[in-house]
Amino acid sequence: MLKIEKSSEIKRENGVLMSKCTANVPGSPMSVYSFNVDGILIDTGSSSLLEEFKPYFNEADFDAIYITHFHEDHIGNVAYLQNQRDVPAFIHSSSTSFTPKPFRIPTYRQIVWGESAPFSSTALDETFTSRNHTWEVIETPGHTKDHVTFYNRDLGAMFTGDLFVSPKVKVVLTEENILDTRRSLQKIEAYDFEDMYCCHAGYVKNAKEWIRLKIEYIDELEGKVLTLSKQGKDIYEITAELFPKPYPIIAVSNTEWSPVHMVRTILNRG
């Protein structure tokens, strides 16, 4: 049986209360964040880390939950919080029909993140108002089709879910579209903000510099893939040349996570 040690920490940056909880999978610690600001909770972490998140949930002051996308490490504790506080949860309109149903995921994801109980949800509008601020809901597909980013102009902050994660991503989910991710990064880059709150990287200062690095990385990757394709190499040869490292998650997930999905998207040109 895989032993997973867990840890948590709570901190505050620029008026944003946040909790980082980690599932320490051997050789690959996996962290996820939840954010609390101006009476709203942004993403709820995974059900497997509920006990670690509870001190933060107890400290957090919120009247509503806003979800960046329908994945188990973001929706995992919505049902618990609704049972505790009877608060509404808002998510992309394409996902509201799924939230009242059991969410089935592969076994390896169940082991790390746990299963998510059904919950009630309401479709996001283009904007919403918290206690003191008006927020913009920005469509940012790529990681998932339903992915959104929450922008607070007053705070100069973007809450980006899983849009950023890291500047040089090596593996992605089979459903991801790396070219849509680039378009979404370019979209938010045009906004006026300084800070980014990422559900896996946490609080990111000088956000636009990091966003630009990821855009340039995808540009470079696209160029390399297309060059190798013109040389007659197929998708698997290209993947092996550009990503020779056998990341454990590839085998563990039976290639649900793999660099081949980025290469395929580029060859199909999005």
Predicted regions located by residue number:
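Short, basic, glycine/proline-bearing loop/turn elements
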Residues: 39, 132-133, 167-171
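Active-site HxH/HxHxD metal-binding segment of metal-dependent hydrolases
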Residues: 51-130, 216
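Conserved beta-strand hairpin/beta-sheet module of binuclear metal-dependent hydrolase folds
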Residues: 2-60, 149-161
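Active-site neighborhood of phospho(di)ester-bond hydrolases with catalytic His/Asp-centered motifs
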Residues: 42-45, 63-71, 89-93, 139-142, ...
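Residue-level signal for the nucleotide or nucleotide-sugar donor/cofactor binding architecture
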Residues: 76, 135, 176
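Accessory terminal helices/loops
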Residues: 1-3, 190-191, 195, 204-270
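Metallo-beta-lactamase
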Residues: 2, 10-13, 94-141, 144-224, ...
